């Protein structure tokens, strides 16, 4: 059983906690604290419960034997009519929870009582252009500041104790289609963010800022042919063209509006000192307009955090013609290959394949399907490149209004979309929220216009099965086998948490937060929150007890883009709640995991 070294006696813990809240509530978040986040379950100061994004907690006071007694202790409403999709992961520092809501709002909440301490609402213009709902996925903490991105493509720094604005910087022009929905991150004292907007023909980029004052430090474009920069004393210094030169993998001038937006944010591997980001779809979707691999779209990138230099890349879907993106999280873990331990990273791609890479150099180790139906490719070659099924690429429109339609699986919303998976080092398994669906897709003619949708394609998403779309899967990265699965009627659209207590938590659009036995997949607990659970659950220790929190609120891309699937969820209610749970106190004190 994992117990904190600070907690020799329960009563002492209560006294210390009270002292912390009263006297040390203003303690600054340090870089060392961020790096040690996975080892300090009393706080959560990173998105992903650690800079590597494993979403694993070493706590086991709450475990597979007692989780059936888990009960709500408080709930907090985001209030007002600004509901829509809620996809944030909360952070917790010194008894205060920090999280975001739809429409670029930030809340600070007392983690013991659910009392709101402060709220910040960004003043958004009327012409914001988010592709996939007005969601936000969370904040970053550093020093005495809270950082988040807005739907009009700004970074905002707030005083974490008062919610007052310390600085605000424009990252990109929202009128071109840029926005920010992902949580930024802190790496070696730098504030790192990506951008969204690939559906509008923006040029993706990753940028680093001084968190104290918002000064831009470096910028790295994610489309081949664009110059990267470092900034000193406010002056831009050229730092190499992404990909070396324009036009190598893009025809004509399309690289100028190439998309590849790193819209989901990234993680950091301190062992290699690399930032790991994914990039989105190339623009436009009509692949016949842009023959070639279209780097660095639908790829994973490793960047030097000092200056943004690209150290390696791996492209999961070259010449993407299905909007499969490559943004999904790349989780660092140690992989045993023939008795040799490799510094690896894994990702479950929207295209339906699960990839294991060497995170020191990006080399392909292995890949395999993780969903039941993939039609666009017949497999992967020895380098991890897809073996295309040419009949599944939608046709060129030619002189017609649209080209020939084809049925493709998975659908463009992906075998797995944004919702983060989790890795449990005790079981050696990844827990992947996935979906089984397909689509009819066809290409159309398109010309770029600033701020307008730049797709050149049409589509209708369809379910593949009558009784389920979502599947929570436990996947062994070494064998490539699925260990267990749990089906869900609606598409899964929320993140996953796993713990040393042999538990896996995730939510459903039907409104349930659920817990599963990490080894067997048996459902061992659930709670109805009143609206779809799209957020990423967290767990932490406070006053000698283990808590679980999750955001509830239906929305996101599925009801907006889901075609026939959207009909399945049309009666699901929107919402905006933060739910927090724990065991009754007497069970917390006697908890243990049985062999």
UniProtKB/Swiss-Prot annotation:
This is Quinoprotein alcohol dehydrogenase PedH. It is found in: Periplasm. GO terms for cellular component: membrane; outer membrane-bounded periplasmic space. Pyrroloquinoline quinone binds at residues 87, 137, 181, 197-198, 263, 350, 417, 493, 557. The soil-dwelling organism P.putida KT2440 produces 2 PQQ-ADHs, namely, PedE, which is Ca(2+)-dependent, and PedH, which is lanthanide-dependent. These enzymes are crucial for efficient bacterial growth with a variety of volatile alcohols. The functional redundancy of the PQQ-ADHs and inverse transcriptional regulation of PedE and PedH represent an adaptive strategy of P.putida KT2440 to optimize growth with volatile alcohols and aldehyde substrates in response to the availability of different lanthanides in the natural environment of the bacterium. Exhibits enzymatic activity only in the presence of lanthanide ions; maximal activity is observed with Pr(3+) and Nd(3+), and the activity decreases gradually with lanthanides with atomic masses higher than that of Nd(3+). PedH activity is found with lanthanide concentrations as low as 10 nM and up to 100 uM, with a peak in activity at 1 uM. Binds 1 PQQ group per subunit. CDD domains: PQQ_ADH_I. PANTHER family: QUINOPROTEIN ALCOHOL DEHYDROGENASE (CYTOCHROME C), QUINOPROTEIN ETHANOL DEHYDROGENASE. Pfam families: PQQ (PF01011), PQQ_2 (PF13360). Disulfide bonds join 131-132. The disulfide ring formed between the two adjacent cysteine residues Cys-131 and Cys-132 is essential for efficient electron transfer at pH 7 from PedH to its natural electron acceptor cytochrome c550.
């Amino acid at each position: 059983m994992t117990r904190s070294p600070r907690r020799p006696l329960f009563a002492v813990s209560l006294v210390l906690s009270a002292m912390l809240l009263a006297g040390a509530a203003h303690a600054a978040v340090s870089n060392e604290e961020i790096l040690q986040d996975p080892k300090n379950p009393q706080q959560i100061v990173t998105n992903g419960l650690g800079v590597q994004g494993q979403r694993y907690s070493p706590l086991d006071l709450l475990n597979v034997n007692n989780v059936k007694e888990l009960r709500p202790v408080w709930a907090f409403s985001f209030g007002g009519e600004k509901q829509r999709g809620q996809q944030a992961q909360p952070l917790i520092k010194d008894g205060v929870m920090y999280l975001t809501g739809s429409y670029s709002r930030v809340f600070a909440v007392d983690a013991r009582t659910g009392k709101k301490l402060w709220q910040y609402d960004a003043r958004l213009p009327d012409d914001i252009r988010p592709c996939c709902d007005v969601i936000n996925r969370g904040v970053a903490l550093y020093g005495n500041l809270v950082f988040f991105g807005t739907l009009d493509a700004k970074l905002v720094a707030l005083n974490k104790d008062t919610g007052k604005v310390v600085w605000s910087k424009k990252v990109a022009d929202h009128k071109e289609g840029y926005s920010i929905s992902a949580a930024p991150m802190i790496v070696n004292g730098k504030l790192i963010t990506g951008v969204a907007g690939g559906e509008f023909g923006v040029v993706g980029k990753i940028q680093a800022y001084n968190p104290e004052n918002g000064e831009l430090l470096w910028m790295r474009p994610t489309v081949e042919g664009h110059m990267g920069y470092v900034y000193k004393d406010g002056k831009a210094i050229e730092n190499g063209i992404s990909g070396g030169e324009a036009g190598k993998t893009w025809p004509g001038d399309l690289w100028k509006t190439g998309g590849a937006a790193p819209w989901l944010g990234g993680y950091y591997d301190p062992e290699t000192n690399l930032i790991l980001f994914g990039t989105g779809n190339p623009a436009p979707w009509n692949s016949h307009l842009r023959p070639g691999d279209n780097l660095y779209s639908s790829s994973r990138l490793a960047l030097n955090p000092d200056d943004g230099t690209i150290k390696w890349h791996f492209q999961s879907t070259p010449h993407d013609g299905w909007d499969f993106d490559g943004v999904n999280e790349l989780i660092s873990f140690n992989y045993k290959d023939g008795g040799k331990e490799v510094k690896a990273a894994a990702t479950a791609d929207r295209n339906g394949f699960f990839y294991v890479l060497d995170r020191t150099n990006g080399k392909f180790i292995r890949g395999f399907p993780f969903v039941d139906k993939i039609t666009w490719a017949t497999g992967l070659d020895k380098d991890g490149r897809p073996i295309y099924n040419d009949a599944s690429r939608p046709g060129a429109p030619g002189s017609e209004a649209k080209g020939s339609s084809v049925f493709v699986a998975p659908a463009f919303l992906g075998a797995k979309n944004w919702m983060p998976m989790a890795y449990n080092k005790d079981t050696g398994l990844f827990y992947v929220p996935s979906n089984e669906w397909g689509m009819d897709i066809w290409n159309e003619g398109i010309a770029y216009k600033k701020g307008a949708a730049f797709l050149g394609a049409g589509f209708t998403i369809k379910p593949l099965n009558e009784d389920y779309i979502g599947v929570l899967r436990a996947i062994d990265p070494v064998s490539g086998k699925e260990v267990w699965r749990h089906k869900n009627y609606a598409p899964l659209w929320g993140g996953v948490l796993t713990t040393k207590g042999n538990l896996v938590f995730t939510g459903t659009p039907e409104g349930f937060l659920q817990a599963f036995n990490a080894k067997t997949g048996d459902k061992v607990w659930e709670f109805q929150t009143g609206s779809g659970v799209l957020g990423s659950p967290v767990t932490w220790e406070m006053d000698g007890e283990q808590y679980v929190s999750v955001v509830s609120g239906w929305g996101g891309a599925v009801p907006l883009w889901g075609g026939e699937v959207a009909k399945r969820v049309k009666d699901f209610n929107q919402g905006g709640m933060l739910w927090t749970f724990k065991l009754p106190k007497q069970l917390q004190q006697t908890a243990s995991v049985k062999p």
